[in-house]
Amino acid sequence: MRLLLILLLLTPVILAGSLDEEPNNADGANAASFTADQEGRHKRSLDVVLKEDGCPKYCSSDSDCCIRDRCLYIPQTGKQECMYKGPFL
């Protein structure tokens, strides 16, 4: 039930993001910049360290973590990590 609610809430955001992209010009300028943007996102995604469950290990906010994880500062490492916060929240 929660998953359905999350999907319903995210659908307008996903659609809005796809509609914001500009169409390509005849000279291909937008196509080149879009490709560069995709390349930057791909490089960032390769830098993400994942835990065994496939969720990100490090974070800067709760939105960087999986749904049941929370972004917490770990004094021993000096970094913020996504930590499991439990099934009932």
Swiss-Prot record:
Residue ranges the record marks as coiled coil: none
Subcellular location: Secreted
Tissue note: Expressed by the venom duct.
Origin superkingdom: Eukaryota
Keyword Membrane: no
Processing and modification events after translation: Contains 3 disulfide bonds.
Record has Disulfide bond as a keyword: yes
Domain notes: The cysteine framework is VI/VII (C-C-CC-C-C). Has the PXY motif between the first and the second Cys residues.
Protein name: Teretoxin Tan6.8
Species, as recorded: Terebra anilis
